[in-house]
Amino acid sequence: MDQVINDTLVSLKKVSKSFPTATGSFYALKNVSLDIRKGHLIAVTGKSGSGKSTLLNIIAGIDKPSDGEVFVNNIRVDRLSESELASWRGKNIGVVFQFFQLLPTLTIIENVMLPMDFCNRYPRNERRDRALALLDLVNIRDQADKLPSALSGGQQQRAAIARALANDPPVIIADEPTGNLDSHTATSIFDLFSRLTRSGKTVIIVTHEKEFSSYFERVIAIADGVIENQLVTV
């Protein structure tokens, strides 16, 4: 049955991912099964090379599993073609990177509008107003017409979160989103992620910052491609 029915938004069933090496196959993920519910804030932790980023890439459809099944929002992601994946990802997954990756020659509002232009999800005459509303949500509306270089690191990360929300995706994936921010700014970013989950978004974050564990419904620890343990925090 190629569907998951209930409030589970992300479901991995016996997922493995291998990469060829000179000495044989290297398994970044090994027989991973995982269910994540709608509206939850989830942390993924583990040492470098443990499989954290591969897990995020599998959920986002950036990588396909070698074995197993991947469902996101009732779609069997691992069966989509490359062209189908590009369209699906643009509408269903918002990605926030550690280093923001805003285009430096575009203004903040132009950066936020880019995913809307790519997916053509909203009428062109509505996109600027939607982008302004998202910048208002992340408290940097007054920075809309500035270039990224004029903003602080925390403001740029807020802009990146607004961009990730551009097409109203149900899932936000963030890879070390506060790794280069001071503690106060990082706290404000986690506060924002928490607000997003209360509005129904599912947020999955790779993080090493244990001081923010109280924000998460669950902490998933990965070691050598295997889920080592899952700590329910609420």
PLM region spans:
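ABC-family P-loop ATPase nucleotide-binding domain
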Residues: M1-S18, N229-V234
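H-loop (His-switch) and adjacent beta-strand-loop-beta switch element
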Residues: V219-V232
